[in-house]
Amino acid sequence: LWDSYMNSLTWEELVKLFTDGDGGKDGPVQFGGTCWQSTPIAAATWNIELLEEQGKMYGNQALLVGLFSWRGPGTNIHRSPFNGRTFEYYSEDPFLTASMAAVIVDGCQSKGVSCFAKHMFANVQEYNRADYGGVCTFATEQVFREIYQRSFEWMVKYGHTNGMMTSFNRVGYVVNSNNWAVHEELLRNEWGFTGATVDDAWAKDFVSCDLMLRAGDDTLMGSDTAHKCYVTVGQWDASLRDGKGDVLCPTEDGDDTFESTTHYYAMRKSAQRIQQAKVNSNQYKNFASDFELTATVSYGLANAAQIACAETTDFNVT
């Protein structure tokens, strides 16, 4: 069934799925949104039952406004108070971070919201993180596994996350978004992840979209560069491969083109994972998309989020 569906998509449609990872509601300080406690405050409760309920509340609100994915939670480690996004991450303790992250993801995804947990992994500073080539992070394998990867592993194994957001830093000298070992060997083959991935927002020139696609990072979440690569400049030629069609990519100097079957395969594989993540979310509502979900919600500073959108909320389906 999936083969038949993917065969029906044009090259342009496959490219759009890869390059169209941005959009939707935005930001922790968005006007008109719901204000929640900061993530370290949540971790300070040590209350996984409470965090699971909060995840369900996130999911309920997403259902009401028509969202099927959440670019979160952020689960990097508080390596330093000067991290830059410490307010967005749970703790300096990997066990506490992993425990909180797994249950809030599990709660949110119980409502059909795909959680693109971020930023996998070792994203420990913001300065030089993206604009100047990606900071190089070095550690032993034990340190990476026990501290910086644990929350992401637990969100896959116990939170059953349907998404993952990668980071712009480098592991050693290799850009995380372009790292085959991170995406295919660790995330999918070892941890058993079956969802889709997205890179961090606004990729710079050092993030090769071509290598990103081939490494198994499925979606580009916006870019303010030309990202000159086969992804956007490759052209479909229906006459190739005995009439089955294939992609013509430009040579390095741009004066000629060559046939690249491997590039088509990588693009198709990522596009299929993106589509599978969508149909496993609430976007299609089990293909009963002609109904409308509404609820009576009170607004105002005095209104508690638990009252507004707790599990006891009465939803009206029309």
Region spans (language model):
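Glycoside hydrolase catalytic-domain context in secreted enzymes
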Residues: 1-318
